[in-house]
Swiss-Prot record:
Free-text domain note: Ceramides bind to ORMDL3 N-terminus and stabilize it in a conformation that physically restricts the accessibility of the substrates to their binding sites in the serine palmitoyltransferase (SPT) complex, hence inhibiting SPT catalytic activity. In the absence of ceramides, the N-terminus is flexible and permits substrate binding, thus liberating SPT from inhibition.
Record localization: Endoplasmic reticulum membrane
Name of one Pfam family that matches: ORMDL
Protein name: ORM1-like protein 3
GO biological process: ceramide metabolic process; motor behavior; myelination; negative regulation of B cell apoptotic process; negative regulation of ceramide biosynthetic process; positive regulation of autophagy; positive regulation of protein localization to nucleus; regulation of ceramide biosynthetic process
Family: Belongs to the ORM family.
Keywords: Endoplasmic reticulum, Hydroxylation, Membrane, Transmembrane, Transmembrane helix, Ubl conjugation
Topology Extracellular: residue spans: 118-121
Modification after translation, per record: When hydroxylated at Pro-137, ubiquitinated via 'Lys-48'-linkage, leading to proteasomal degradation. In endothelial cells, ORMDL3 proteasomal degradation is controlled by the sphingosine 1-phosphate receptor signaling pathway.
Quaternary structure and interacting proteins, as annotated: Ceramide-sensitive subunit of the serine palmitoyltransferase (SPT) complex, which is also composed of SPTLC1, SPTLC2/3 and SPTSSA/B.
Function: Plays an essential role in the homeostatic regulation of sphingolipid de novo biosynthesis by modulating the activity of the serine palmitoyltransferase (SPT) in response to ceramide levels. When complexed to SPT, the binding of ceramides to its N-terminus stabilizes a conformation that block SPT substrate entry, hence preventing SPT catalytic activity. Through this mechanism, maintains ceramide levels at sufficient concentrations for the production of complex sphingolipids, but which prevents the accumulation of ceramides to levels that trigger apoptosis.
Coiled-coil segments on the chain, per record: none
Length: 153
């Protein structure tokens, strides 16, 4: 028995999406965002769907693909300091259930948004660019890659 040690992960960022109820909470948060946007007067339903998609994808991009490091003191000699949250998730193992969920969620939201905006050209272009912005960094080939040196340090 190790006295004075906790039974937690070395880096809590690696397992946060595997916590109980986190997927349901995530979907409910997206639904809540959509309902709040729907309650704004004089905003049409297609605009609300596009705003829901854009806000979700912007938040996902910022929190998963630009913020690096961990808010915890980790004994990994600073390895997590240079990794984004997406790269830390599940210890960098690709194609886990959490990664699949976070990859499929913006795609489903994109399909819903495209349907409810009736494939309007402006909405379609905005939503497609937004989707590509969050899907491309999730590709396994881009694990640890910094395009043009952006977010290198």
């Amino acid at each position: 028995m190790n006295v004075g040690t906790a039974h937690s992960e070395v880096n809590p960022n690696t397992r946060v999406m595997n916590s109980r109820g986190i997927w349901l909470s995530y979907v409910l948060a997206i639904g809540l965002l959509h309902v709040v946007l729907l309650s704004i007067p004089f905003v049409s339903v297609p605009v609300v769907w596009t705003l829901t998609n854009l806000i979700h994808n912007l938040g996902m991009y910022i929190f998963l693909h630009t913020v690096k490091g961990t808010p915890f003191e980790t004994p990994d000699q600073g390895k997590a300091r240079l990794l984004t949250h997406w790269e830390q998730m599940d210890y960098g193992v690709q194609f886990t259930a959490s990664r699949k969920f976070l990859t499929i969620t913006p795609i489903v939201l994109y399909f819903l948004t495209s349907f409810y905006t009736k494939y309007d050209q402006v909405h379609f272009i905005l939503n497609t660019v937004s989707l590509m912005t969050v899907l491309i960094p999730k590709l396994p080939q881009l694990h640890g890659v910094r395009i043009f040196g952006i977010n290198k340090y």
